[in-house]
Each structure stands twice: as C-alpha cells, then as structure tokens.
C-alpha cells in the first residue's frame, strides 16, 4: 500500500513541470485514500502529498479547493504528531492567505482553524493561527480588532518561549498603529520587535518583514530616506531569496526613496539592475514615470502618471502619502518659478501656465502666503495676485540681545573681581 503511494507521489512530482492538472489529480487520490495509522511510510507520503497539493493549488489559483483541502485533512491530523500537524495547518493556511484571492472566506476559515485548535487543546497552534488572524484583520483594515486580539496574544506570548511568534505579533502591532497614524506607538512596537529579534535567529521572511517595517517608520516619522532605503534594500533581498510576492513592494519603496532624495535619475539604474530585472512590469513602470516627472519638474506628467497607474500608486497607502507630499512640493516650486518675474499677475494666467484649475491655484497660493513662502496678497475681486518685495529683516532685536548678552558678561566679570577684593 505504502510502496504504491510512494510510486504515485514520485510520478506526481515528475509531472509538475509538464502537466500540473494530472499531478493535482494524482495527489488528490493519495490524499483521499484511507491509510493505517501505524504505517509510518504511508502517513509520511500522505503528509507530503497534502503539502505538495496545497502548493500546487495555490500556484494555479484554486483558492476554494485549497480552503476545502484545509478542512478535509483535519481527521488525518490526529494520526501525526502535534508539531507536524501544526506545521501542516500553518503551511496550508499561509498558502491560502498568501494567494490574496479575496474569496471573502479568509477570516471565517481562520476562525474555524482556531476553534479546531482550541477543541484539540493545541495551544501553540492556536497562538500561531491567532497571529495569522491579526495579520488578516490588518490586511482587511479591521484595525481595532487587530489591536484587541494582538494585545491579548502579546500578554500570552511574553510568558512563553516562542520569540519568533512574539516578534511577528509586535510587528503587526507596529503596522496597525502606523496605519492609524499613531507613529509614537508604532515606533515603540517596532523597537520591542527588534529587541526581541536580536535574541533569536529570524527566518528570512520574518527578517525581511522587520526590515520593511523599519524602512516605513524611518520614512514616515523621520523622513530619513537614506536609512529607509537601506532597510528596504535588505527587505527586498530577503523577500527575493524566498520568492515572496512582497519583493516587488519593497522594490517600489526603494524607488520611492530615490525619488524623495531628489535623485530620480537613479531609478532607471535600479530598475535595470540584475536583481530587479525579473520584477519589471507596471509596478516599476509607475515609479519610473513619477521619477521622470520629478526630474522634469512637470506637474502635468506627474498627474498623468497618477491617473495611468492609479492602482499601483494611489492604492498603496505608503506610496500615496509620500507622493502627495512630493506633488505638493513640486506644485510650490512651479508656482514660485512662474510668479518670480511679476509684481502683479492674473491668477487665470498662472493656472494656464501650470495647467491647473483656477480654484486649485488660488487655494495653493493662499496657503503659501499664510506659510510665508512669499510675500503678497490675493485680490479676489480682480482675480490677481500682488507680490511684494521681501521686507528687510529688522535687526533691532538681534542687536538688543547682543547688547544684553555683553552687559551680562561685564556684570559677571565685575562680580568676580569684587568677590576677590573681599
């Protein structure tokens, strides 16, 4: 019985590159076959077949079948060790969730697995699955639920020895706080995660996630784009080494750093590099267009890139936030360049030069006047901008402060001399 299963499994593996459907059918037949619990070889072959079948279903985009497989194998899990059962469930669930197929059953399936782990009294597996559920809540923007479950899980994990899972949950907490714009707490959670990670060996995926979050926090809080770039590069190498789909995201963030550092010319060199070449596509093209617009200081090209690559740029909250700031800076630079030769200019004329609506130009000019980017007033009655010369800096206060400082030194000197005489 076991020998026949081994032969079938080997045949299924040999068909992986030529006929995936046939390979899936063979693996299905092995998985559905009843086996004797005391037949170790048959149990091992069935376990390998389940993992191989799960991987194939994920690669071929069969999310519903993969979800069904996860439920179907539960009775078999009682015939293998708890550690192997936990690995099998986690692997299948990770494959299902990493597909990002948006079936709408992700949370439900995860909760079912958690309930099964609770009923079987498998604490470690339950904690691992709850960590995955926190991640799922984060991905579906259910931030309060993510924080609530995450804080419960953290209290449990700090009493136990699973440091890798603790790092994972601390990272998720940091991501959630960042999504809620609570940067101090996001940074504190990240610091905790890095401290815990320093004491253990981090698998490549976890290390890459840690580097990615470090880059995001450095970019968001400190605007330290050079440090952020080095973190994103480390994350990219980590994800690339395990063929993770998140590698392209870290590459996008690397390109974003180059744009924000005012070195858009480096973007082309990065994209055509050996490591990044395999990720060429719409994601990288979007950032290349933004880099070109930034280099040419062209608002029209910038807006065209945002329209043409809406999904790649606007739907990513990290890129969208920073590109909004870049657009704002670019608009200010363009406006200052346009109004520089004038002392009085029609707003209509400015809007025609930079190809933006009159209302948008008026709103931005008002903001710039309030921020003291230049001195002037808007005459809305006549629809003109009146620009004043920059007033000379009044140095009276500086001179007064300098005089007081010098007098203070004289008084101190006289006091020390008088003290010596007494």
Swiss-Prot record:
Protein name in the entry: 26S proteasome non-ATPase regulatory subunit 11
Keywords carried by this UniProt record: Acetylation, Isopeptide bond, Phosphoprotein, Proteasome, Ubl conjugation
One of the GO BP terms on file: proteasome assembly
Taxonomic source organism: Mus musculus (Mouse)
Function of the protein: Component of the 26S proteasome, a multiprotein complex involved in the ATP-dependent degradation of ubiquitinated proteins. This complex plays a key role in the maintenance of protein homeostasis by removing misfolded or damaged proteins, which could impair cellular functions, and by removing proteins whose functions are no longer required. Therefore, the proteasome participates in numerous cellular processes, including cell cycle progression, apoptosis, or DNA damage repair. In the complex, PSMD11 is required for proteasome assembly.
Record-listed Phosphoserine modification sites: 14, 23
Ranges of residues in domain PCI: 224-392
SUPFAM superfamilies according to UniProt: TPR-like, Winged helix' DNA-binding domain
InterPro entries associated with the record: 26S_Proteasome/COP9_Components, PCI_dom, Rpn6_C_helix, Rpn6_N, TPR-like_helical_dom_sf, WH_DNA-bd_sf
Cross-link named Glycyl lysine isopeptide (Lys-Gly) (interchain with G-Cter in SUMO2), sites: 274
Subunit architecture: Component of the 19S proteasome regulatory particle complex. The 26S proteasome consists of a 20S core particle (CP) and two 19S regulatory subunits (RP). The regulatory particle is made of a lid composed of 9 subunits including PSMD11, a base containing 6 ATPases and few additional components.
Family membership noted in the UniProt record: Belongs to the proteasome subunit S9 family.
Transmembrane segments: none
GO CC term, one of those recorded: proteasome accessory complex
Residue positions where N-acetylalanine is found in the record: 2
